[in-house]
Amino acid sequence: MPRDGMVYKLNYLLKSQSPTSPAAQQILAAYLKAAEERKIIPGTRAGEGEYDVKQSMDVIIRESPGQVLALAKAMRKRLGELSTGCLVKLAHDLLGAAPKVPAGQRAELESLLYDEYRPPLVDRLRNDMGSLELIDAVVALTALKNPNAGWQELGKERYADRIWRYTTLEPKGEDVLHHREGKRFRNITLPAELKGWSEPGFDDSGWKKGKAPIGVGLYGDSNLHFKNATPWGDDEFVLMRTTFELDSTDFDNVRVRVLNNQGYDIYLNGSKVYTYIWWCYTPEYGKGLACDKNLLKKGTNHLAVRAGSVYPKDVHVGQIDVYVEGLRKKDLLDAGKRP
């Protein structure tokens, strides 16, 4: 397998050729052979061989949809050699490429991913339920034949229908930050009446109420954005609280999904579960933040959030929505069993 310099030159040449040209086909055949045959030496040098294999796989998946199925078949015998991270990436990349492969190959590729790639990932998951990346890979492959397996939104009502109590506040004194500052999320002094605002017993009956996302301005663009369900207002920060009901807490993994453009603090039943101090560029509900499952309780659970906003070109923009998901190990691992 050529090293980085030669790989760069080959990729440059590949991009300059028609995908069906003899030169391009020869280069792609070499990459396929490298992915299939490059030796991965066990031990401390395993990463070197695996890096070369990943380079070859990436080129084929990116440049030649017509050879994705051939790559998936070629890599079957190597699945046990790959690290969990590499195997997870390969499964995700092959699954992501499925819509682009020739229509006549798509069903075979998806069956191959479910029948031959999913089992070794499940085996690894039995011993590592703490890896959200591994869980997501198994969920994605399981969804090919059982879309209901995997993460479940917690609560008896959809998060989009949930009512939040919220209030906004503008920093004062030394907490004020110029609008041109992009990194804005920070601790600020709260008024005395907001002491304990994140605790389950706090009285928020005087706050405004509405559904999420709570927002102001346009986060994203006209083609990619989530519509604000409730107006944020003019202040820089928002505090928001809601509840959800559970009949059972027998989840092996719990995670929090967040739509945000600036930083936030999240509390579950009074305990802070996550703080994010930076910003996001793309409107999406993030894949999820691992959360201590022991914080959940039967009955009413309390979710509290403090979020910030930003002022690009002096236009006020902020958006926040949060919900919780749970996963049962048995439901996921048994989902692919044949009757």
Language model features with spans:
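Surface-exposed, low-complexity/disordered Ser/Thr/Gly/Pro/Asn-rich loops and linkers
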Residues: 200, 205-234
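Aromatic-lined ligand-binding clefts that engage carbohydrates, nucleic acids, or primary amines
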Residues: 207, 236, 244-270, 303
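An acidic-aromatic loop/edge-strand motif
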Residues: 151, 156-193, 279, 290-339
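Solvent-exposed beta-strand/loop surfaces of large extracellular or lumenal domains
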Residues: 268-289
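Short beta-strands within extracellular/lumenal beta-sheet-rich domains
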Residues: 234-245, 286-288
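Long, ordered, helix-rich scaffold segments
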Residues: 1-151
